[in-house]
Regions:
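Active-site loop-to-helix junction immediately N-terminal to the catalytic Tyr of the SDR YXXXK motif
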Residues: 1, 47-55, 67, 95
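Substrate-binding pocket helix/loop in short-chain dehydrogenase/reductase
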Residues: 2-10, 92, 103
Length: 147
């Protein structure tokens, strides 16, 4: 892997999250309320061959989420992370039928997820119903990675 490939992925997935959070957190602290929901990946939880940069960045988001949750929880702010598995998106559209079938073999629910599966969790974590959930990385992966 070239240094540039490493740097670009870390900058997008980890540094970008830091910069966005830094820009928004002061207002949340002032209002004593906020919901921060980071988008990670099961690759950050279980690793993925050929994606050491991506897996490292997404694993870093889990640490970021936990640490920030401890820092700002007393101010009414929850911080969580959603870790999608294999979801029907542009990232999986390139897979041929054989590759897709092989992936599905390893998923206990025997299907790829949908964007709706992810958005439903994000909406829940944004709501008052999730006011006692913080510092968590929640997988939406059909059971692919259980810990």
């Amino acid at each position: 892997m070239k240094d540039e490939e490493w740097d670009d992925v870390i900058a997008t997935n980890l540094t970008g999250t830091f910069n966005l959070t830094k820009a928004l957190i002061k207002n949340m602290i002032k209002n004593r309320y906020g919901r921060i929901i980071n988008i990670s990946s099961v690759s950050g939880l279980m690793g993925n061959p050929g994606q050491v940069n991506y897996s490292s960045a997404k694993a870093g988001l889990s640490g970021f989420t936990k640490s920030l949750a401890k820092e700002v929880g007393s101010r009414g702010i929850t911080v969580n992370s959603v870790a999608p598995g294999f979801i029907e998106t542009d990232m999986t559209a390139y897979l041929d039928d054989n590759a897709k079938a092989k992936l599905i073999e390893d998923i206990p629910l025997k299907r790829l997820g949908s964007v709706q599966d992810i958005s439903d969790l994000v909406i829940f974590l944004s709501s008052e119903d999730a006011s006692y959930i913080t510092g968590q990385t929640i997988s939406v992966d059909g059971g692919l990675f259980m810990y």
